[in-house]
UniProtKB/Swiss-Prot annotation:
InterPro entries tied to this protein: FAD-bd_PCMH (IPR016166), FAD-bd_PCMH-like_sf (IPR036318), FAD-bd_PCMH_sub1 (IPR016167), FAD-bd_PCMH_sub2 (IPR016169), MurB (IPR003170), MurB_C (IPR011601), MurB_C_sf (IPR036635), Oxid_FAD_bind_N (IPR006094)
A cellular-component GO term for this protein: cytosol
Keywords recorded for this protein, A-Z: Cell cycle, Cell division, Cell shape, Cell wall biogenesis/degradation, Cytoplasm, FAD, Flavoprotein, NADP, Oxidoreductase, Peptidoglycan synthesis
Species of origin: Mycobacterium marinum (strain ATCC BAA-535 / M)
Pathway: Cell wall biogenesis; peptidoglycan biosynthesis
Essential cofactor(s): FAD
UniProt-listed PANTHER family: UDP-N-ACETYLENOLPYRUVOYLGLUCOSAMINE REDUCTASE
Catalyzed chemical reaction(s): UDP-N-acetyl-alpha-D-muramate + NADP(+) = UDP-N-acetyl-3-O-(1-carboxyvinyl)-alpha-D-glucosamine + NADPH + H(+)
Protein name: UDP-N-acetylenolpyruvoylglucosamine reductase
GO biological processes: cell division; cell wall organization; peptidoglycan biosynthetic process; regulation of cell shape
EC number: 1.3.1.98
Family to which this protein belongs: Belongs to the MurB family.
Length: 366
């Protein structure tokens, strides 16, 4: 890896050339970036992106990828002449029940900081890898809670104008694992998150608990509120059993987490599925239909934990959680896409339901 000091060219940010991206992502796949620019402050993020976007408009810059934790992205092997801006601004401030986290802050550290101040609302989102800035993009959720439940506003850099402004949550079109900020192509982001503000509960209690597996672990009833630290501990234990807490020594955690979102279908599709399988189909109410459990669909379609079962396969389903596509060592983005297509097409052939990917796919497609 070559490093160089470019002075004020990129607002004082750290610049390196010929950088392998695989070690910077939780899936551990990706090409070698021509240039990696690491921004440790918000001013650097803004200055670097303004510079690169000006160059791109003049045809003087190749593709630009912006990311922080690298936990929800699959980067194609063949991307050439790629410039990567790594967002590493990480200040977290707490004022009363308001928590403000810069985009590069490690998400789980934000959760811990809130709990240590007696604030509830984020504990069910414990253990999720990645950065604070990624949470509104994806509308991150787990165990019955979504981050949009507590986001008040997001500070954005508009890539087309270079302007920075706070945007209220109501203008972000939050939905299930999506928002107006999410783009199918991670190279075409119209706006970049700089900071996120959350309004939490200062009563010392968690968000209402509604996820059956979690309430059972805590010995509580649905709708009850627990002590945030206890809820966090239970969530981390559940995630660890599913290989959803990062561990460099455990290849089941070399993933982007759940690769497919839970599909939302019309009620008649759910009824057809129940009749087809003759089973009690896990399902949840959704605003625009019925939400099904993607992991259940995978396993019933023949894609169980550890699929395809070949110990030499470089990419396999996790041995702990069928929804996670994992790198067993030496896998490429192409290997991941082959397995993802096999699973997606197999579920569609059996049930007539097409699963959609949860991570952002950059330079690759299903």
């Amino acid at each position: 890896m070559k490093r160089r000091d470019v002075g004020s060219l990129f607002a004082g940010a750290r610049v390196a050339e010929s950088v392998p991206l695989a070690p910077l992502t939780t899936l551990r796949v990706g090409p070698v970036a021509r240039t990696l620019v690491t921004c440790d402050t918000t001013d650097q993020v803004v200055g670097v992106l303004r510079e690169l976007d000006d160059r791109a408009r003049n045809g003087d810059c190749g593709p630009v990828l912006v990311f922080a934790g690298g936990s929800n992205v699959v980067i194609g092997d063949a991307l050439a002449d790629l410039t990567v801006v790594r967002v590493a601004n990480d200040r977290v401030t707490i004022d009363g029940n308001l928590v403000r986290a810069e985009a590069g802050a490690v998400w789980d550290e934000v959760v811990v900081a809130a709990i240590e101040r007696g604030l509830g609302g984020l504990e069910c989102l414990s253990g999720i890898p990645g950065s604070a800035g990624a949470t509104p993009v994806q509308n991150v959720g787990a165990y019955g809670v979504e981050v949009s439940d507590v986001i008040t506003r997001v500070r954005l850099l508009d890539r087309s104008t270079g302007e920075v402004s706070w945007v209220p949550a109501a203008d972000l079109s939050f939905g299930y694992r999506t928002s107006v900020l999410k783009q199918a192509d991670g190279l075409a982001l119209p706006a970049v998150v700089l900071e996120v503000e959350f309004a939490l509960d200062a009563s010392g209690r968690s968000a209402p608990l509604r996820y059956g597996e979690l309430t059972a672990a805590l010995g509580m009833n649905s709708g009850e509120r627990g002590e945030p630290r206890a809820v966090r501990d239970a969530v981390l234990a559940l995630r660890a059993r599913k290989g959803m807490v990062l561990d460099a020594a455990d290849h089941d955690t070399w993933s982007v987490g759940s690769f497919f979102t839970n599909p939302v279908v019309a009620p008649e599709i759910y009824e057809r599925l129940a009749a087809q399988t003759g089973e009690s189909v896990p399902h949840y109410p959704a605003p625009d239909g019925v939400k099904l459990a993607a992991g259940w669909l995978l396993e019933r379609a023949g894609f169980g934990k550890g699929y395809p079962g070949d110990p030499h396969a470089r990419c396999r389903l996790s041995s702990k959680h069928a929804l996670a596509l994992t790198n067993r060592g030496g896998a490429t983005a192409a290997d991941v896409m082959v397995l993802a297509r096999t699973v997606r097409d197999g579920v569609r052939d059996v049930f007539g339901i097409t699963l959609k990917p949860e991570p952002v796919l950059v330079g690759c497609a299903l």
